[in-house]
């Protein structure tokens, strides 16, 4: 049993213990309380979870950010499930490992140091916590001759002066008492306070030998780190100009000590959760037994695992982490679901534990209470995904899971090629170096198995491997190049081969490494002129810092050296720039650079800016001569004038603000768990892909979204921008952030649009350019909606002038369709009527014409109804079209080059009842899968000759790969072999079924290519 020897008059609750710690430092010692950062790393891409109290202050120690206060105290939420700190595998088997835990800590940033830190710690332990110092041991750094660092005798003397006898002050080496952030950077000695839970087992001398020996009855309680050195790349150590203190004490262990418990799980942090499990599942009460403790130990271990995982899942989901984007979280969540179902026979148990977790932790972390329903919704969604995955799993898939149990964490229904890709990775990984999947292999995964970049990144995470994304993207570019006959079009319409473009990119990177950074703050200097209804962007005069002519660095260039003025590229780096470079999903600006013309001073030379890059803190303007002239001259140090294309910037700006309003409107209207997957902003349109749980967006929803945004535009709400630090951002609760995004420590731009009367609030971190007032957007409309995943929707929208153009196009089309409908009503049909309807329908579906989405859907329904009426008079003739279409197809695709047929019968759109058997009978010599779509109903039939049937390739399996996209039901005709022939029952689809059809056929094609 943990025993502090001095029995407290009253056992403190966990809440009181946490509050006592925080009050000790804030009230008694002038510290500032800083709330816990989310467990999602905010400014640190090096870790998957916040796993220590110091994570949010790492940049302060590195010197890249200012300290929020000189003295800080907090209780930090931490998660450890992988990497160096991996507690997942042992959770539940002992009394002190957890995936989620709290770290109590106090910090000094250049203020107090060793003596004050030790004194404050001992004061708390001996005073408010009433721990007998006779149960405490302390350690100090013994020094390291190799590093040339002496023993921390100062620390030894401090503890002596605070009343510790020398027998309780123990020296240890680097492994135990020297802290380092990394291979280089801040580091320093530490002192640890250990507590003896069983002092009756031996003398001080005997027990002292057990410190740092891995004993459960003598454990570390508090670690005080003194950051006073800096390790350099050559391994040498030097003193830091300012010294810091970083301390950490595990809250769960401290609570067990103060509540006189032998296990962290016996404290009031966990017992309410155990009670909730027992009451819901009606299982035997938790008894606290551990492995080797009999039959009860198995159940008790499950109690501990489920309680721990419920805390971890609740904390992560409340902080905005998503299982779909973090496989470690999904693994823990699914393990908790499995235990709930298989051990406690209660499939809703995990969601019932969330309110209990919130009750135990919500006072310290109010975001948990605020997000409680969202957490429950996310768990329910993940449970449904997991359930569907298991239910739809074939025998073959079950065998795969037995072979590769790790794949249980992946939604394989979204990517049928994942399993064979995983198998190939297992075979090939021994050939890879540095635990990195090479770019050419990544490209093979996408090309052969249909994996997306997102899915192969999940694959790499599953195997704890890295990906050579740079080489992969080069392979993708090379494939595009080959497809276009070794030529591809670059920005601005010029042609250059990939090798040249790569050389230019490498030269740009080398050039910018040696130059001073560009002042790019001028890109935010612009205003809106109401009279002209346009943006005013003042030109910027600045000096040239560096220059390339194609891939060659030059100090001076002139017209005579530019052999091909419309294709030769000039890369110019300037001291300042008002051009926006592509970032935050927003495309870069276009415009011109004006260069002095010494022959005609009033007519400067002009360079077209066709691209803008940001490299090594420099802005690179990629230019071409606007017109060929030998008189053109430009040298480093020359003054130039940068002119941004204001019209393009205005469209980009309006579309970026529109993207924020769209995101906010969806969250406001539907009150569902919503998260951003991706966004892109251009002068043509904006795209926003969102995860939206528990809601299927319909045509009427689109109209609601548009209406709300247009009312916000009419309300002329101001768009405000605030500059914040990361610490200031974390103090706010209502900011929309992109899950998994890593933000800088300083200079974060918070874009805020508030329309209280319309109950819409948009607060997003964003580096893009934005309108100054919503009225500048003029109007807004959604032009496309696509469901990209089980719970993901991609919106395409336009605003401003682009939206006005779309509405004008819609008005013209509405007028024409109205006239055609009048012809139907008066029976004044001509032979050209059907042709015109088909042309309109084709243009709406297959061209780049933009129309309001709701209008487009309504119009397609009207056209479909008119075409249906036309078909009634020619049904028999049209059925013959099917035979003609199939015979033509088979002639064009002979057996020797096309071992299988996968075909959508286009003429099926004209005939209400096409017997697909009629089509498959025409192809008896090879596997065939044919699809028809008529009156918004999709059907399919598959036949496989007996000679082609295998366990993995047969009619049922092949058709299933197609049907999954539509959630279609398949079955063999009565009395027939499902491996030889199979039908998909008709499924209703929208008028915009082409995208779904393309996706389904792509999966079926990949399946046949892989297994036939």
From Swiss-Prot:
Record keywords: Aminoacyl-tRNA synthetase, ATP-binding, Ligase, Metal-binding, Mitochondrion, Nucleotide-binding, Protein biosynthesis, RNA-binding, Transit peptide, tRNA-binding, Zinc
Subcellular compartments: Mitochondrion
Alphabetized InterPro entries for the sequence: aa-tRNA-synth_II/BPL/LPL, Ala-tRNA-lgiase_IIc, Ala-tRNA-ligase_IIc_anticod-bd, Ala-tRNA-synth_IIc_core, Ala-tRNA-synth_IIc_N, Ala-tRNA_ligase, Ala_tRNA_ligase_euk/bac, Thr/Ala-tRNA-synth_IIc_edit
Signal peptide: none
Protein's UniProt name: Alanine--tRNA ligase, mitochondrial
The organism of origin for this protein: Drosophila melanogaster (Fruit fly)
Uppermost EC category: ligase
Binding site residues for Zn(2+): 656, 660, 766, 770
Span of chain positions assigned to the transit peptide in the UniProt entry: 1-24
GO cellular component, one term: mitochondrion
Entry comment, domain topic: Consists of three domains; the N-terminal catalytic domain, the editing domain and the C-terminal C-Ala domain. The editing domain removes incorrectly charged amino acids, while the C-Ala domain, along with tRNA(Ala), serves as a bridge to cooperatively bring together the editing and aminoacylation centers thus stimulating deacylation of misacylated tRNAs.
Classification via SUPFAM superfamilies: Class II aaRS and biotin synthetases, Putative anticodon-binding domain of alanyl-tRNA synthetase (AlaRS), ThrRS/AlaRS common domain, Translation proteins
Gene this chain is encoded by: AlaRS-m
């Amino acid at each position: 049993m943990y025993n502090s020897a001095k029995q407290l008059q009253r056992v403190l609750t966990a809440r009181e213990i946490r509050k006592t710690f925080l009050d000790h430092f804030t009230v008694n010692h002038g510290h500032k309380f800083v709330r816990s950062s989310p467990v999602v790393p905010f400014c640190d891409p090096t870790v998957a979870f916040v796993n220590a109290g110091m994570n949010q202050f790492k940049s302060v120690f590195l010197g890249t950010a200012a300290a929020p206060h000189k003295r800080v105290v907090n209780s930090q939420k931490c998660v450890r499930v992988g990497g160096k700190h991996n507690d997942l595998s042992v959770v539940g088997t002992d009394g002190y490992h957890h995936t989620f835990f709290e770290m109590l800590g106090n910090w000094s940033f250049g203020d107090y140091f060793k003596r004050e830190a030790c004194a404050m710690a001992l004061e708390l332990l001996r005073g408010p916590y009433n721990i007998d110092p006779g149960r405490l041991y302390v350690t100090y750094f013994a020094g390291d001759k190799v590093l040339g660092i002496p023993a921390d005798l100062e620390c030894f003397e401090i503890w002596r002066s605070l009343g510790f006898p020398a027998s309780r002050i123990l020296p240890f080496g680097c492994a135990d008492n020297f802290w380092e952030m990394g291979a280089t950077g801040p580091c320093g000695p530490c002192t640890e306070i250990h507590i003896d839970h069983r002092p009756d087992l031996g003398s001080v001398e005997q027990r002292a030998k057990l410190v740092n020996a891995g004993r459960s009855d003598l454990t570390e309680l508090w670690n005080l780190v003194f950051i006073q050195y800096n390790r350099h790349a050559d391994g040498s150590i030097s003193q830091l100009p300012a010294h810091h203190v970083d301390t950490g004490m595990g809250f769960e262990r401290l609570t067990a000590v103060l509540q006189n418990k032998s296990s962290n799980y016996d404290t009031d942090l966990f017992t309410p959760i155990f009670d909730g499990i027992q009451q819901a599942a009606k299982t035997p009460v938790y008894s606290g037994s551990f492995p080797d403790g009999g039959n009860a130990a198995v159940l008790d271990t499950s109690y501990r695992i489920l309680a721990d995982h419920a805390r971890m899942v609740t904390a992560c989901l409340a902080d905005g982490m998503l299982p779909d984007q973090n496989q470690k979280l999904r693994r823990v969540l699914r393990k908790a679901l499995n235990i709930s179902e298989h051990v406690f026979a209660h499939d809703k148990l995990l969601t019932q534990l969330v309110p209990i977790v919130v009750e135990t932790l919500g006072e310290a972390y109010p975001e948990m209470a605020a997000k409680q329903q969202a957490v429950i919704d996310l768990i329910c969604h993940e449970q449904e995904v997991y359930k569907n995955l298991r239910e739809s799993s074939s025998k073959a898939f079950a065998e795969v899971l037995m072979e590769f149990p790790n794949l249980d964490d992946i939604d394989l229904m979204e990517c049928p090629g994942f399993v064979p890709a995983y198998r190939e990775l297992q075979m090939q990984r021994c050939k890879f170096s540095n635990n990195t999947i090479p770019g050419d292999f990544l490209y093979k995964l996408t090309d052969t198995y249909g994996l997306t970049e997102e899915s192969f990144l999940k694959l790499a995470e599953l195997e704890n491997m890295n990906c050579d994304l740079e080489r992969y993207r080069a392979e993708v570019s090379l494939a595009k190049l080959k497809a276009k006959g070794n030529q591809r079009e670059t920005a601005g319409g010029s042609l250059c081969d990939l090798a040249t473009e790569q050389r230019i990119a490498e030269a740009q990177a080398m050039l910018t490494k040696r130059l001073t950074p560009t002042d790019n703050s001028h890109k935010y200097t612009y205003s809106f002129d109401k009279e002209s209804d346009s943006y005013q962007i003042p030109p910027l005069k600045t000096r040239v810092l560096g220059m390339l002519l194609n891939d060659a660095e030059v100090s001076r260039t002139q017209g005579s050296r530019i052999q091909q003025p419309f294709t030769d590229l000039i890369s110019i780096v300037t001291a300042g720039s008002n051009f926006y470079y592509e970032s935050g999903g927003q495309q870069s600006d276009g415009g011109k650079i004006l260069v002095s013309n010494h022959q005609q001073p009033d007519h400067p030379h002009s360079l077209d800016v066709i691209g803008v890059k940001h490299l090594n803190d420099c802005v690179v303007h990629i230019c071409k001569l606007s017109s060929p002239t030998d008189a053109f001259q430009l040298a480093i140090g020359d003054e130039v004038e940068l002119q941004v294309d204001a019209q393009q910037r205005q469209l980009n700006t309006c579309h970026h603000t529109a993207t924020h309003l769209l995101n906010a409107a969806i969250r406001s209207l539907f009150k569902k768990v919503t998260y951003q997957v991706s966004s892109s902003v251009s002068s043509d349109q904006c795209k926003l892909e969102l995860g939206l749980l528990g809601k299927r967006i319909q045509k009427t929803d689109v109209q609601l979204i548009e209406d709300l945004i247009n009312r916000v535009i009419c309300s002329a709400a101001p768009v405000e921008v605030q500059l914040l630090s990361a610490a200031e951002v974390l103090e706010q609760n209502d900011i929309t952030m992109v899950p998994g995004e890593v933000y800088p420590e300083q200079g974060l731009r918070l874009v805020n649009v508030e329309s209280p009367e319309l109950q819409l609030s948009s607060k997003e971190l964003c580096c893009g350019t934005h309108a100054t007032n919503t009225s500048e957007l003029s109007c807004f409309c959604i032009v496309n909606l696509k469901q990209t995943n089980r719970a993901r929707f991609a919106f395409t929208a336009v605003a401003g002038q682009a939206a006005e153009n779309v509405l004008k196009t819609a008005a013209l089309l509405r007028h024409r369709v109205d006239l055609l409908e009048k012809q139907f009503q008066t029976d004044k049909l001509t032979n050209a009527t059907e042709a015109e309807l088909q042309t309109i329908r084709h243009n709406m579906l297959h061209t780049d014409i933009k129309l309001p989405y709701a209008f487009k859907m309504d119009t397609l329904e009207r056209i479909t109804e008119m075409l249906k009426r036309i078909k009634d008079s020619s049904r028999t003739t049209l059925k013959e079209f099917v035979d003609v279409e199939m015979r033509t197809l088979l002639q064009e695709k002979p057996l020797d080059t096309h071992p299988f047929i996968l075909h959508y019968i286009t003429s099926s759109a004209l005939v209400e009842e096409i017997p697909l058997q009629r089509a498959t009978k025409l192809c008896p010599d090879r596997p065939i899968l044919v699809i028809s779509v008529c009156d918004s109903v999709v059907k399919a039939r598959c036949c496989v000759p007996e000679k082609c049937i295998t366990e993995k390739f047969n009619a049922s399996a092949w058709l299933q790969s197609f049907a999954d996209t539509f959630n279609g039901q398949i079955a063999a005709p009565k009395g027939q072999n499902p491996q030889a022939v199979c039908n998909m029952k008709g499924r209703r689809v929208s008028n915009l079924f082409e995208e779904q059809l393309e996706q389904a056929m792509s999966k079926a094609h990949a399946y046949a290519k892989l297994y036939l």
